[in-house]
Amino acid sequence: MLARSAASLSTTAATTQSNMSVTSQFMDANDCKFIVYKASQIRLTEMKRLLGVLVPNLKKRSSQNKNIVPLVTYMLPLLAGPVLNVNAALKEKYNQIVQGQEPTKDNKDYDVTPRDWLTYVMDSNTQNQPLEGCELVEFKKELYDKDKQWLTVTRLLKLIDEVISTYNNKFKSANLLKKTYSKSIEDLIKPSELSLCLDLAVLITDYERDTSEASFRKLQWQVIEKFLATLHSKVEPTLKTYYKSLLAYQSGKLMLYKLPFPEWTIHRMFAFTVRMISLMKLFGCELRVLYYPNRKYLNDLKTKLVCENVYKYDLLITQIEKLCADPLYQIKESKEMMQFFQKYPYSLPKSLPQKTHEFFIKKVISTCINHWNNNTKLVEDWVEMWKFCDKNNSAKEKIESSNEEQLIKMYDERYTVDKLVYLEHEEERAKLSNKKSIGIVVKSSSSSSPNKLLRKLSPISGMAKPKVRSTKSPASSSSSNSNSNSALSSGMATPKERSRRSSVDRGLPKGGRLPGLTKTNTNERLVAPLIHISETSSVSNSGSSSINASPLGSRRGSIKDESAARKMVINRTVERTRSKIGNRPRSASLQSNESAALNSVGIVGSPLSNNRLPKPVSNQSQLRSNSLESNSALNRKMVQDTFKHLMANNPKPSNLSHSPTSSPMRPSSPIPSRSNSNKVSSTNNGAILSPEPKGKSKANNSNDKIKTNGVTSINIDNSDNEIVLKPLPHESKDTTTGPVRPVDESVNNLSEGTPAGSESTPESMKSAVGIEGLDKENLNVESGNMESGEPSKKVRFVGVPPMTEAENPKPTRKGWYKKPAVLHYPPVPQQVTMFRDRLRQEGMVFRTSLRDTVAATSNEVGKKGGMMLSLAIDNPPVKEISSHSRFASKLREKLTR
């Protein structure tokens, strides 16, 4: 047994090794001739057999008082191709039969030279040329002529017998019957489409009705649909199966020895090519019989006007015309294929069959398959359009009474409109296909590296890019500002992210000014009305010494429209810059609350700026709790409650405001430019302007302008509604003289808006006189909610003088805010209680026997000191619906029984 099994294994291994070492046999000119002859012989033999079956059956039924007409006109194209094109005499006989004439008697032998295979395979001047000029009426009359159709069948059978005998003689003379690979190509050259002949017959019961124009068109549709169905169901499966195996072999997925008949691969590929060429010629000839008799009707203006799309219809008709004129025009236009065929098979390298395989698959077979698919799709679309035109009766009635000029005009209009529609539709299809392909690539790339994509989208992944300051006109600045805000609104960071990023920002280089953008997320729950902020002066970036010496400022986004701002969230881009003065970075805990900008109002005193006093702001307080959670609603509410409590105990107002920051300005700038953000820069020594009360906004909305150089602080006391002008102790060293307005007019304009009973102090008027002759400075204004009387804290930085006691009074109570009375912790998770109760239940079940009484159990536990069980009995757990509790309850029930 072991010897037999070893022998069988060795035989199998030897067979497998021999199969893997199979090489394709070489092909010569005799092989080409044999394949063409064999294909023609099989086709003729099959056609003769089918006609021999069809004719007796039709004659038998006709004798039973049934008028059955064989449609031989549609059978003749099935013999097109290299079958009857071996010689000019045979071609002439074939054409005479198509015309309904008696073929000439000629019994001479038809010879074909070995190199002439391309001529009788690719010749296109041999099929149904007389049909090109026929009329529909004459064609229909001959088609339904029963006697003439039977006569054509007899002539065709006689011609088939002559050609079969000719091929048999050629096989004998050329000694081609010894070819051993005939069975290897039979599956590819088998004419399965000839079975259509058995269906090409029509039964006529009422001659007038069955031969009408509508019935004739319906018959043509049935013929072409039956023809296409036969091709799709019986011809294409075998060819496409072998084509797929060839593609797998070309790509390396399939070895040569796994192909069918691997040693005859070149012969099979040549047979495949001859088969495809024959099918394409057959297809074109069948299309001729259907199109040429209806050409006049299909090209009529009335037919075109009732179609679905005039431009698409014209394209289809043009392609059908070319296909009928020469079914192989697409192959002949390929110069590479024609050059290969002209030299084939003498150009085949005997030592390199693999290159021949690749060329055959890529250049010849794939090209034929593509042309075949395009042609079948073209005919299917044409038949659908033809049916639509014939059944569109409503459109036919509308254009029935139109003359030729009106039809031409309507056609031109339809052609222009339909062309645009068709081209747009094709562009959309192309874009959709591109999007699908791009989506697949993006999906694969994103799934392979999702972390990389998240790092790109995350605002904390790295430092933000520095923002370049520019001096633009107000219009251009505001437009660019809105664009930048809309572009950055989707990727803004939260206040927590900004506070965490402060530790990263401390790594900036010393000395030089490196501004960094921080993308902030707008609080979508707060929607403030429109806030009018005056335009700031342009920022100078020429002097590096002034930039390094001055504190750094922050600017906010541009102003939105009043109607739009009441409905949408204000998107703001905050620019924060860091600098180290005295080797100490800016503290992250002293950042101003970003949500304060929603209730901020600022006015910059400039002779050329169009200043507008603020409109009423919302009553919602925007005080900050701490820098780490400045945007938290809970902490903000706690801070508001704390300050309300403090203000109730200490009614004395404290002059508090948000943190001012300063930025340099260009003294020589003639036109003030709106900054890229909503917040205005302040002066070097921290001059601020607090907003006026609610009642002053309308009165002060005129062209009121204030001039200051940064040495004066204009404060509004909320207690008695006074405007106070206070001189600050330090003057800016960089100020230059510029054109100014008298301050008295500005102060008077401000005073006009104050309520009755408010008056300016002499000290403030004295300080106002000193404003003349001083240069303008850029002011940073941040307003608090002055309607409720709540103060805000003014924060100073390095290089800014400290606040006086009057400006910053000491608080009466210690601590930033009081601690809450009760700490509300979240509820205990349900899983914890379930686990605890489950332990108690299991203890009750398994520690003691449940068959005893509860009293005995409790006494026993009391003696043993079982505290856990006693607690469990005193406080029975709540029954839960879970898998574990169900299991315990079932076990307990079984034990208690």
UniProtKB/Swiss-Prot annotation:
It comes from the Eukaryota. Residues 444-523, 537-562, 607-632, 647-794 are annotated as: Disordered. Transmembrane segments: none annotated. GLC7 phosphatase-regulatory protein involved in GLC7 subcellular redistribution and chromosome segregation. Keywords: Cytoplasm. It is found in: Cytoplasm. The keyword Oxidoreductase does not apply. Residues 495-508 have a biased composition (Basic and acidic residues). InterPro entries: GIP4 (IPR026241). One of its GO terms (cellular component) is cytoplasm. Residues 444-459, 473-490, 537-554, 657-677 have a biased composition (Low complexity). Its main location: cytoplasm. One of its GO terms (molecular function) is protein phosphatase regulator activity. Belongs to the GIP4 family. Residues 678-687, 698-718, 746-764 have a biased composition (Polar residues). This is GLC7-interacting protein 4. Interacts with GLC7.
